[in-house]
C-alpha cells in the first residue's frame, strides 16, 4: 500500500511539474505577444499628426481607432496636394459622447 501511495505522489508531482512548464511557455508566448503589440502601439501615428504616407497607421483612441482623414490643399502656385491627418470621425465622436454621458449618469 505504501508503494502505491509513493507512486501516486510521484505521478501527481510529475503531472503538476509538466503542467507548470506548459503554463510558463504560454506565459512567455503571451508576454512576447504583448511586447509586439506595445511596439506597434509606439509606431502608430498619434491624433492630429500627418498620415499622408501611412493611411492605416493611426493609433487607437479611447474607444475607436483614429481614421486618416484627407483634404486637398491648393498652394499659392495653384498646385493641388493631398494632406492627411489622424482624427476622430464625427460618428465616433458622437458615440464617445453618448458613452461618456452614460457613464456620468449610471457610473
Curated annotation (Swiss-Prot):
- Does the entry feature the keyword Signal, yes or no? yes
CC per GO annotation: extracellular region
| Coiled coil stretches, renumbered | none
Q: Annotated Gene Ontology MF terms?
A: toxin activity
Q: Name the keywords, alphabetized.
A: Disulfide bond, Knottin, Secreted, Signal, Toxin
Which positions correspond to the propeptide?
21-41
Q: Where in the cell is it found?
A: Secreted
| Highest taxon above the source species | Eukaryota
Tell me the disulfide pairings in this chain.
Answer: 44-59, 51-68, 58-86, 70-84
Tissue-specificity statement: Expressed by the venom gland.
What is the protein's given name?
U1-lycotoxin-Ls1q
Q: Which organism is it from?
A: Lycosa singoriensis (Wolf spider)
Amino acid at each position: 500500500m505504501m508503494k502505491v501511495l509513493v507512486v501516486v505522489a510521484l505521478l501527481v508531482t510529475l503531472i503538476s511539474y509538466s503542467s507548470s512548464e506548459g503554463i510558463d511557455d504560454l506565459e512567455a508566448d503571451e508576454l512576447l505577444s504583448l511586447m509586439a503589440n506595445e511596439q506597434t502601439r509606439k509606431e502608430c501615428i498619434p491624433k492630429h499628426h500627418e498620415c499622408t504616407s501611412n493611411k492605416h497607421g493611426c493609433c487607437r483612441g479611447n474607444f475607436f481607432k483614429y481614421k486618416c482623414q484627407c483634404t486637398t490643399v491648393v498652394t499659392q502656385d495653384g498646385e493641388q496636394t493631398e494632406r492627411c491627418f489622424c482624427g476622430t470621425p464625427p460618428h465616433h465622436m458622437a458615440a464617445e459622447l453618448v458613452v461618456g454621458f452614460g457613464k456620468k449618469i449610471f457610473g
